[in-house]
Amino acid sequence: MSWNQYPGGGHHQQGGYGYRPPPPQWAQQGPPPPPNMGYRPPPPPQAYYNNPPPPQQYQRPAPQQNGYQQGGYQQQQQSQGNYRTSNGGYVPPTGAPVEASYHHTGAGYTPPSGTPQRTSAPYGAGAPIRPPSQAQHYGPQLQGQGGQSAQPYFQYSQCTGKKKALCIGINYVGSSSALAGCINDAHNVQKFLIERYGYKSEDIVMLTDDARNPRQIPTRANILAAMHWLVQGAQPNDSLFFHYSGHGGQTPDLDGDEDDGYDEVIYPLDFKTAGHIVDDDITDCKGRHNIMVRPLPAGCRLTAIYDSCHSGTALDLPYIYSTEGVIKEPNLLAEAGQGLLSAGMSYLRGDTGGMLQGIMGIGKKVMNQNSGAMEKARQTKTSPADVISWSGCKDSQTSADTQEAGRATGAMSYAFIAALTKYPQQSYVQLLNTIRDELKGKYDQKPQLSASHPMDTNILFIC
């Protein structure tokens, strides 16, 4: 079956990605936290659950019409054993779409209701404005083959085009490291996108380990296929949304592109047999898989939420922002030798001035001696697309699986929805602060904001 027949079909699965996380954080910092309070990397499960039972206290919702088709979907009888494909996707089981409400089948939480007291958050000055529509140029002129020069650029998405979403929730039912709130998170985010941002249920793919359709079980193959579906056919001003709630961890970095020596990983339901999924697999910054970031055109938005442990740089984006809206970790400095002469160097502050002069000199020498340096620059982690990632914690932290309003949930998923429910019109820096406020005093984790380009964090968050 070709890739066009099934997104990700025939997709090469990487070897060598066995379960090899470093010692858990609590090993050096005292006793482990209480059960279900952190999304730590799970130990190998006792068995792989092809057809897992519903988790306790979770009632299976009505079958949902979630397909991988580009322009809608067709209905198929659930009893059929073969899943025909059309336009690059499978056909989901039949059933009425879920109702557009936050609270589903008694399993999810109910975010704050009623009219918010104010539309914008108390951080920053005034109401945020929408992002500009024209291309944004930044950094120095780069010289390529034939003496031609060009300046790096990106384009904000207006989010007025096609809207597609992929929501993944894995409770690891029956395993020794089962979680309670991840399936709820996926359904609650789905409902939030439908109600607040105009997404359609037929354009949202759900992968949960209680699904009836085997193509909607969050195995490694299904997750990678769904990622392909999400970005397939992306156009400027489209809005794509990726949400993952489940176990996350770290594995030793083999090529030196991580400052802390570890790549970030997420754990599919079948990670023991199929392996985990590394951040580099998702971004294709090493040429391994062309999935989530590299295929996107300028002006296309991808919003990602990682509600998992060690997720600070889970999407491997180079610009990480502080609660003051400034770059706090200039990861691009490590990429100068690859031909990227500092996308957004003018945004870096503090004591990096002298260091930048040296890097610019090295970069200029590389550009003069290597005619392929421009291509190398295009293969780094920056992108002309508008890619934003919200993660539940720093790379060194765990992310809580907890309860809010008496319902099982991931702390980050809950905080994201609650913050935007209270204050629908927020800038990026405002939203980062209000998300942290939702968790302050209850959890140690610090949610992170990262981007594929230097951004104005005072513009309006849209998706």
From Swiss-Prot:
InterPro entries: Caspase-like_dom_sf, Metacaspase, Pept_C14_caspase. Residues 20-56 have a biased composition (Pro residues). Involved in cell death (apoptosis). One of its GO terms (biological process) is proteolysis. GO terms for cellular component: cytoplasm. Belongs to the peptidase C14B family. The gene is MCA1. GO terms for molecular function: cysteine-type endopeptidase activity. Its EC number is 3.4.22.-. It comes from Cryptococcus neoformans var. neoformans serotype D (strain B-3501A) (Filobasidiella neoformans). Pfam families: Peptidase_C14. Gene3D superfamilies: 3.40.50.12660. Residues 1-149 are annotated as: Disordered. Residues 57-83 have a biased composition (Low complexity). This is Metacaspase-1. Residues 7-18 have a biased composition (Gly residues).
